[in-house]
Amino acid sequence: MTVLRTRSAVQHARELNNFLSCAAPLSLRSHSRPISGFNRPPPNYPGHVPLNFVERGALAVGSAVGALLNPRRADLIAACGEATATPYFIYRLRDAMLSDPTGRQILRDRPRITSETLKLPYLRSLPENTVGRTYATWLDREGVSPDTRDNVQYIDDEECAYVMQRYRECHDFYHAVTGLPIFVEGELALKAFEFLNTLIPMTGLSLFASVRLKPAERERLFSIYLPWALRSGLRSKELINVYWEKVLEKDVGELREELGIERPPDMREIRRMIRMQKKREKELMEQRGQ
C-alpha cells in the first residue's frame, strides 16, 4: 500500500498504546491482579511492547480495518504486519534465513538500512544499471527516504523482531528492482509478490484494499500485475536472504535473473499512455463538436 512516511514514531506509539489500553474489557482493567491469561508479560528488548492475547487480537483487527479504510496509514500497516505475523509466519521467515548462508550472515551482522548506512550520494554516483543507482533513482523519483520505517514493537522474540525489521527496511529495494511505484496500485502489486515470497499475512491481506481502486486500475491489477506476482513470487528466491548492502554495485538485470524476478510492465508508463490516449480522444470529440 502507499505509505504516509511523515508520521512520527512517537505519535504512532502513543495512538496504538491508547487504542490497546481501551481494547481490554473494563472488568479486566479494573482488577488489580487480572487473571494470568490476560497479563502483559515483561519486554524482551528495548522498545518492545509485549501484548497479551486480547490486546494482540484487538491490534490485529483494529489495525487491519483502519489500514483498509486508509491505505496511507503506514503505522497501521506496520502494526497489522506485526500482530498477524506470529505465532508461525515470522518464525518461518527466520528459519528461512537460518537455512541460508547469506541469511545467517545477515542475522549475525544485523545491518540496518538508512540513508547514512547506504551513503545515498555514493549510490547516485554509481553506473546507471547498478542495484545501488537503481535504488537511489527510485527513492528520488518517488520522493521517499529509507529513514522513515517504524521500529518493530509487537513481536515478542528478539531475533524475529529483527527479521521483521529487516523485511520492512528491504521493502524499498523490492520496489526498486521491480520498478513498481508507491501509489496504491503499485503497492498492491508488490504486496501480492511479497506474500508469495514471504508468506507474511499482512501482505496478502493488503489485497482487500483493491476494492478502493478505480475500475480501470483494478482491472489492470488483476489482468497484468497479479499474474506477474504469481509467476515471480512462486519462482523467486527468498528475498529476505539478499544482503542488499553487498550487491549495490551489481548489475540490476543480472540480480533479477539470479533471484528469478521478472520485471513487470512499467506501471507509470502505462498510466501515462492511458492519460495521453484519453486526452487525444477528448480533443477529437471537441473538434467534431465544433
Curated annotation (Swiss-Prot):
The keyword Signal does not apply. It is a peripheral membrane protein. One of its GO terms (cellular component) is extrinsic component of mitochondrial inner membrane. It catalyses: a 4-hydroxy-3-methoxy-5-(all-trans-polyprenyl)benzoate + H(+) = a 2-methoxy-6-(all-trans-polyprenyl)phenol + CO2. It holds the Pfam family Coq4. It comes from the Eukaryota. GO terms for biological process: ubiquinone biosynthetic process. It is found in: Mitochondrion inner membrane. Zn(2+) binds at H171, D172, H175, E187. Residues 1-7 form a transit peptide. Its cofactor is Zn(2+). The keyword Zinc applies. Pathway: Cofactor biosynthesis; ubiquinone biosynthesis. Signal peptide: none annotated. It is an enzyme of class 4 (lyase). Keywords: Lyase, Membrane, Metal-binding, Mitochondrion, Mitochondrion inner membrane, Transit peptide, Ubiquinone biosynthesis, Zinc. Component of a multi-subunit COQ enzyme complex, composed of at least coq3, coq4, coq5, coq6, coq7 and coq9. Lyase that catalyzes the C1-decarboxylation of 4-hydroxy-3-methoxy-5-(all-trans-polyprenyl)benzoic acid into 2-methoxy-6-(all-trans-polyprenyl)phenol during ubiquinone biosynthesis. Belongs to the COQ4 family. PANTHER family: UBIQUINONE BIOSYNTHESIS PROTEIN (PTHR12922), UBIQUINONE BIOSYNTHESIS PROTEIN COQ4 HOMOLOG, MITOCHONDRIAL (PTHR12922:SF7). This is Ubiquinone biosynthesis protein coq4, mitochondrial. The lineage of its organism: Eukaryota, Fungi, Dikarya, Ascomycota, Pezizomycotina.
